């Protein structure tokens, strides 16, 4: 079990309260698909992903990015039970979608970049450390069924 300090919890929940899930989720997923183009193979049904412009303008990328970040919000609400919170999603991504678990880490790193860009003043080194810890815990929870 992961131990969260009161300060870490406050930094995470405080910033999360300011996040526009639709915008940040869309940006994070779009960046994943652009920066790591091999991840596009999991989104073949999304249509045109042929260029950064196409990806950024793709409504399915935007909708799924919102869905992903909404799920991430479940981690913020359940900091003390992230492993169980993501048990079903881990199973889905492992057994049905066959997503490489390394992609969870990549998306977490991209989320850090998006948050830093959107919340420059609030995203202090302490805040970044708390969020880095969170994205690692979420990535580990999502990869759990792979072990």
Swiss-Prot record:
Residues 3-147 form the Globin domain. The keyword Iron applies. Red blood cells. Disulfide bonds: none annotated. Keywords: Heme, Iron, Metal-binding, Oxygen transport, Transport. One of its GO terms (molecular function) is oxygen binding. Heme b binds at residues 64, 93. One of its GO terms (cellular component) is blood microparticle. Heterotetramer of two alpha chains and two beta chains. Involved in oxygen transport from the lung to the various peripheral tissues. Belongs to the globin family. This is Hemoglobin subunit beta. It comes from Cairina moschata (Muscovy duck).
